[in-house]
Amino acid sequence: MADVTLSRTGQVSRKTNETAVSVSVNIDGTGVSKIATGVGFFDHMLDQLARHSLIDMEIKTEGDLHVDDHHTVEDTGIAIGQAIAKALGDRRGITRYASLDLAMDETMTRAAVDVSGRPFLVWNVTFSSPKIGTFDTELVREFFQALAQHAGITLHVQNIYGANNHHVAETCFKSVARVLRTATEIDPRQAGRVPSTKGTLA
């Protein structure tokens, strides 16, 4: 039987009239990241995503920031999702499901994921301010929508409570990171099988 843990890496380069994005990921990494999107707060969040998922990420985005951050954030999410999907391949042997409540000071956020091959986002997060510094808070959802769609995952994110918008955003990234870490891990009891009675995840 083939080693399902062999080379779980993915690389994507994506260029449009609005952005140029290059992403490489290693699902079986240690959370090392090299990130440059031109958007400081977003870089900080992506660093959290890599660190707590233990997925190594190298991300370089050049976007039309003279317009706003939207295209940069969304297209980076698309490319990360595509790279993760490539790295997972047919998803053979993975744990598949995970959920977690994550605390950060006064904030609690819940994330649940099914690495199913079927993209869907349920988003129950509200920010009390339209911006964190200069970053539009609505872009947090846009990022996760792009990630879920292109990684082929069903993702639920719910902020249970929290007063600080930075903490709310950060717990979204950290909780999603932790469930991705668990759900994409190889389960030795699966013995290399696809974790579905259908025999495929699509």
Curated annotation (Swiss-Prot):
PROSITE patterns membership: IGP_DEHYDRATASE_1 (PS00954), IGP_DEHYDRATASE_2 (PS00955)
Pfam families given in the database record: IGPD
MF-aspect GO terms: imidazoleglycerol-phosphate dehydratase activity
Catalytic activity: D-erythro-1-(imidazol-4-yl)glycerol 3-phosphate = 3-(imidazol-4-yl)-2-oxopropyl phosphate + H2O
A GO CC annotation given for this chain: cytoplasm
Pathway(s) served: Amino-acid biosynthesis; L-histidine biosynthesis; L-histidine from 5-phospho-alpha-D-ribose 1-diphosphate: step 6/9
Subcellular location: Cytoplasm
EC numbers, comma separated: 4.2.1.19
Keyword Cytoplasm: yes
GO biological process terms held by the UniProt record: L-histidine biosynthetic process
InterPro entries in the cross-refs: IGPD_sf, ImidazoleglycerolP_deHydtase, ImidazoleglycerP_deHydtase_CS, Ribosomal_Su5_D2-typ_SF
Keyword hit for Zinc: no
Keywords, in A-Z order: Amino-acid biosynthesis, Cytoplasm, Histidine biosynthesis, Lyase
CDD domains: IGPD (cd07914)
First-level EC class: lyase
Family from the record: Belongs to the imidazoleglycerol-phosphate dehydratase family.
Record-given protein name: Imidazoleglycerol-phosphate dehydratase
Source organism per UniProt: Sinorhizobium fredii (strain NBRC 101917 / NGR234)
